[in-house]
């Protein structure tokens, strides 16, 4: 395997180097071909590496950044004042060919704007979309997009999202001719916004896309489709609602059997059930699928949750590794050329 180099916005997210540096070391430990560029405050990063194994540190390079884009900064202002920030410098490593992907837990709006500015969309893509791969109840996975990059999407953008999602399902999930569906408020052809109905008509006519129609929000984790497409507003609300419910469920499992007033055999039974249920549903833990890929650019960008812990940020790095190895941007470009109508 050839050398793989990724750029990390080490200062981004709620916890900065406290999470990004240990996660980087964990990723290096699991992949001997991986090299990382840690972008941020050299003193803070060096301090976080004080006890790191020398063999792992040899595959790390620290790149200095003067400042950090605040998580609550308005994207437009953050982009204008982005020179010298850890996020912009990390993206510039990809633009200049020093890294093959960028991972950041920083300001989502600023990351999307800067990525589009620096890396440019692929031909045929109006705006990039945030995509993740979610587990479903049949122990497979579903590609879901857009998760918040575009609050309002017209029919052309939804079709572009469908094409990109199908490529990811083929290349990452190894699904031949993946099923593609649009999220709607019902499965009848007459329901939904005009943009959704128009996108459905285009997808039905595209022989290269295996379009199966509409699905509703409660089908998100059923495994009825391989690719689920929606605008960013619907996708973001849907994802965060699902994550909140899953975290509540796992928290309730963890709390079972802890009551001191229960008989010993009831506490024991509770712990046994807790372990079995946690094992059965643990794959739904949001930490295990952290990292949304910004699809539609001429480079790979992964957006981690701002509140990601070490385990979750490591998963985001691994998402970037997979996207680069599968050549997702290049394969999307080839598919777009085959599916989308040529412009005059």
Swiss-Prot record:
Native source species: Erwinia tasmaniensis (strain DSM 17950 / CFBP 7177 / CIP 109463 / NCPPB 4357 / Et1/99)
Catalytic activity: a fatty acyl-[ACP] + phosphate = an acyl phosphate + holo-[ACP]
GO biological process entries: fatty acid biosynthetic process; phospholipid biosynthetic process
Function recorded in the entry: Catalyzes the reversible formation of acyl-phosphate (acyl-PO(4)) from acyl-[acyl-carrier-protein] (acyl-ACP). This enzyme utilizes acyl-ACP as fatty acyl donor, but not acyl-CoA.
NCBIfam families, A to Z: plsX
Subcellular location: Cytoplasm
Protein's recorded name: Phosphate acyltransferase
Pathway info: Lipid metabolism; phospholipid metabolism
Keyword Lipid biosynthesis attributed: yes
GO cellular component: cytoplasm
Subunit structure of this chain's protein: Homodimer. Probably interacts with PlsY.
Pfam family, one: FA_synthesis
Family affiliation: Belongs to the PlsX family.
Coiled coil: none
Tagged with keyword Lipid biosynthesis: yes
Chief subcellular location: cytoplasm
E.C. numbers: 2.3.1.274
Keywords annotated in UniProt: Cytoplasm, Lipid biosynthesis, Lipid metabolism, Phospholipid biosynthesis, Phospholipid metabolism, Transferase
GO molecular function terms attached to this record: phosphate:acyl-[acyl carrier protein] acyltransferase activity
């Amino acid at each position: 395997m050839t050398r793989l180099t990724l750029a990390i916005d080490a200062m981004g997210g709620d916890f900065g180097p406290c999470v990004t540096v240990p996660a980087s070391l964990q990723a290096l430990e699991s992949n001997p071909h991986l090299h990382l560029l840690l972008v941020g405050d050299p003193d803070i990063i060096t301090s976080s590496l004080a006890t790191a194994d020398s063999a792992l540190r040899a595959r790390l390079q620290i790149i200095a950044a003067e400042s950090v884009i605040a998580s609550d900064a308005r994207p437009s202002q953050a982009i204008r004042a982005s020179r010298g920030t850890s996020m912009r410098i990390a993206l510039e490593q990809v633009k200049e060919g020093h890294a093959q992907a960028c991972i950041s837990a920083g300001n989502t709006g600023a990351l999307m704007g800067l990525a589009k500015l620096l890396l440019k969309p692929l031909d045929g893509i109006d705006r990039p979309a945030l995509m993740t791969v979610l587990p479903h109840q049949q122990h497979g996975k579903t590609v879901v997009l857009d998760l918040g990059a575009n609050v309002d999407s017209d029919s052309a953008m939804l079709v572009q999202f469908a094409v990109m999602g199908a490529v990811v399902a083929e290349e990452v999930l190894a699904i031949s001719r993946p099923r593609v569906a649009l999220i709607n408020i019902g499965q009848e052809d007459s329901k939904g916004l005009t943009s959704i109905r128009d996108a459905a008509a285009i997808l039905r006519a595209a022989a290269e896309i295996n379009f199966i129609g509409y699905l509703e929000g409660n089908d998100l984790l059923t495994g009825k489709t391989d690719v689920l497409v929606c605008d960013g507003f619907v996708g973001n609300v849907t994802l965060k609602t699902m994550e909140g419910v899953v975290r509540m469920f796992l928290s309730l499992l963890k709390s079972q059997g802890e009551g001191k007033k229960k008989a010993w055999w009831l506490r024991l039974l509770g712990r046994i059930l807790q372990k079995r249920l946690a094992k059965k549903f643990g794959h739904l833990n949001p930490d295990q699928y952290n990292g949304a890929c910004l699809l539609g650019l001429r480079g790979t960008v992964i957006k981690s949750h701002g509140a990601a812990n070490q385990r979750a940020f490591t998963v985001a790095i691994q998402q970037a590794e997979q996207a680069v190895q599968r050549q997702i941007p290049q394969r999307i470009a080839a598919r777009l050329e085959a599916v989308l109508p040529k412009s005059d």
